[in-house]
Regions:
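Conserved Rossmann-fold NAD(P)-dependent oxidoreductase catalytic core, especially the SDR/UDP-sugar
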Residues: 1-24
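A conserved pocket-lining segment of Rossmann-fold NAD(P)-dependent short-chain dehydrogenase/reductase
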Residues: 17-22, 63, 69-91, 95
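Active-site Tyr-X1-5-Lys
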Residues: 20-49
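Glycine/proline-rich active-site loop of Rossmann-fold NAD(P)-dependent oxidoreductases
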Residues: 43-46, 58-70, 103-113
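Conserved SDR Rossmann-fold cofactor-binding beta-strand/turn motif
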Residues: 52-53, 57
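Glycine-rich Rossmann NAD(P)(H)-binding loop
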Residues: 58, 83-86, 113-120, 130-131, ...
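Mid/C-terminal beta-alpha module of Rossmann-like enzyme folds, strongest
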Residues: 99-157, 190-203
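Conserved C-terminal active-site "lid" loop/helix of NAD(P)H-dependent oxidoreductases
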Residues: 127, 151-182
Length: 203
């Protein structure tokens, strides 16, 4: 959802109902597709389990994977020496992959499984990278005014977006997803190290 309270915890009962084609088109497409699928299986003898990951980090297979979610970590390798005051909820791609496989026979029919590991501020991610890898990674937080100025010229940022996200955070209740689906449960340091090393390997 694009509307949330600071500190809100989302559950598998929540839907992206406020999204539209012009506002959060990605969330709208995902939400509408799931609603259509759930309606379709409701009148058929078809088993349905859905997987809902937070932002997905981890080793990549191709340069095109540097866009999307991994652009957050690409910033630490190739971006400017500062970070936005943004909180990122993420999970390891390897946990997400196993979740999809194990859901086939271990997932409860009709259930929505949130797959999420941790939420960190970008400056915290920089600190973990600095303590784990060679090189220097950004930890200096860009002041809000300068962040808004940056958004005016950045193709992937908008002032409206930053007004919602700067200095705010949410989280997710994963319930028993990791246990039920028997996920490896990668620790955050491993995820971040493997992700950044994978980004560097694309050069």
């Amino acid at each position: 959802s694009s509307k949330f309270e600071n500190g809100q915890v989302f559950t598998n009962k929540d839907w992206c109902n406020d999204a539209s084609e012009t506002s959060n088109a990605y969330g709208f497409a995902k939400s509408e597709a799931e609603k259509i699928m759930r309606e379709w299986v409701s009148n058929r003898n078809v088993r349905l389990v859905t997987i809902h990951p937070s932002i997905v980090f981890g080793p990549i297979l191709h340069q095109r994977h540097l866009e999307g979610s991994m652009s957050y970590l690409k910033h630490f390798v190739k971006g400017p020496p500062f970070v936005l005051d943004v909180h990122i909820n993420f999970v390891d791609v390897r946990d997400v992959a196993i979740a999809h496989v194990n859901a086939l026979d271990k997932g409860e029919n009709g259930k929505r499984y949130i797959i999420h590991k941790e939420g960190l501020w970008m400056k915290e991610i920089g600190r973990i990278l600095n303590s784990s890898l060679e090189g220097k990674y950004a930890t200096r937080k860009l002041p809000k005014l300068f962040a808004y100025l940056l958004a005016m010229f950045h193709p992937k940022l908008s002032i409206n977006q930053l007004k919602k996200t700067l200095g705010t955070h949410v989280s997710y209740d994963v319930e028993d997803s990791f246990v039920t689906l028997e996920l490896p449960n990668y620790d955050i340091r491993t995820t971040l190290i493997d992700s950044v090393n994978s980004v560097k390997a694309q050069d």
